[in-house]
Amino acid sequence: MLLKNASFYDDEVLKRADIRLKDSLIIEIEENLSPTNNEEVVECEDLFVLPSFIDLSVTNLEGYENLKQKAFKGGVGLLNVFNGDQSGIKNIMAIKNNQLADIATLKNKGGEILIAPSDAFLELISHYAKSYNLPLLISLENSFEALNSGALAYELGQNFVDNAFENTRLVRFMEVSRALQIPVLLDKVNSIATLKLIKAFNDLGAKLQAQTPLSHLILDESVYEDYEPRFKIAPPLRDKEGQNALKEALKNNEIAMLTSLHASKNSNAQLFEESAFGCESIEDAFSVAYTFLVQKKVISFQQLIKVMTINQAKFLKLNAGEVKENQLANLMIVDLNAQTRVSNQNSPFYGLELYGEVQRMILKGQTTFIKENACKKS
């Protein structure tokens, strides 16, 4: 496949060239490349090519194939799915049914990342991560309270997360990272207190990174005043001050990765109190991130690529995440001038006007999604 007249970033440098894909890799990037016999040519004039996103915090409640198609539409090529047997990234759930999993066997079967949903068996899990050189993702089970503690929770009469205790378990993993020198990614980080603790432990030699949900950078808890079930997200949204602080932290590189936190709403309850927790957002991931983070000048386009794919690829030691020769051809082609509106009524972003739209997704050199009438073939 030959991508003609592609605009893309090579590190921090904006370039324009042709990109040749073959046998799952990017094999050549040059100006004015000529197609070979029977080579598919995709015209990228006025479009932008960037590495497909990698999402490390996805819950599957809808069937894996359906989930993948939604992800491709949102520019997400690789998924780390917590529940179920299918995941684009082969993960090892350290604890199942309150028992320690057979981590050694699962690693030998191709496990790429170790996930800890609680601090049970902490010592054993940590030593497995160290011994097998596995990156450790800490994604603690949610308390499933609708709001964070504060004035709004009291005003609305909703159950709330007591913020006084939100970091007590995380600190144990922070110390393990420092003591054993294990790379650890802390998932669903959404408070400045947690980020300050991460910095303090990293200053002592820990290898910690933070991953934050897109929703918590774009929305704040004032949306709960409408009692709409689509805003019932776990963990709950922060107040405006907390949201702005997260955006500043992202701008200052204190947040390494972002996630859609996608989880389907598995109920049709109309009442906020009775509705299921969830965040149906992956099918608009690129457009949401580009609109509210890049267009709003929270971060640059280059930094968006770092927090949505480059840092994830490095954490997982994948040969992907950048538009470079000899990297995996995991790419998306986007129209940055296209305007769309979120149509999924279960999405927390429903009705919002967005900029930027995925036209084509390519994984290992093969097209997995193409928008109708997009990316003309030459």
From Swiss-Prot:
Alphabetized UniProt keyword annotations: Pyrimidine biosynthesis
InterPro entries: Amidohydro-rel (IPR006680), DHOase/Allantoinase_Hydrolase (IPR050138), Metal-dep_hydrolase_composite (IPR011059), Metal_Hydrolase (IPR032466)
A GO CC annotation given for this chain: cytoplasm
One annotated GO molecular function: allantoinase activity
Pfam families assigned: Amidohydro_1
GO biological process: purine nucleobase catabolic process; pyrimidine nucleotide biosynthetic process
Matches recorded under PANTHER family: ALLANTOINASE
Function as written in the Swiss-Prot or TrEMBL entry: Non-functional DHOase.
Family: Belongs to the metallo-dependent hydrolases superfamily. DHOase family. PyrC' subfamily.
Record's protein name: Probable dihydroorotase-like protein
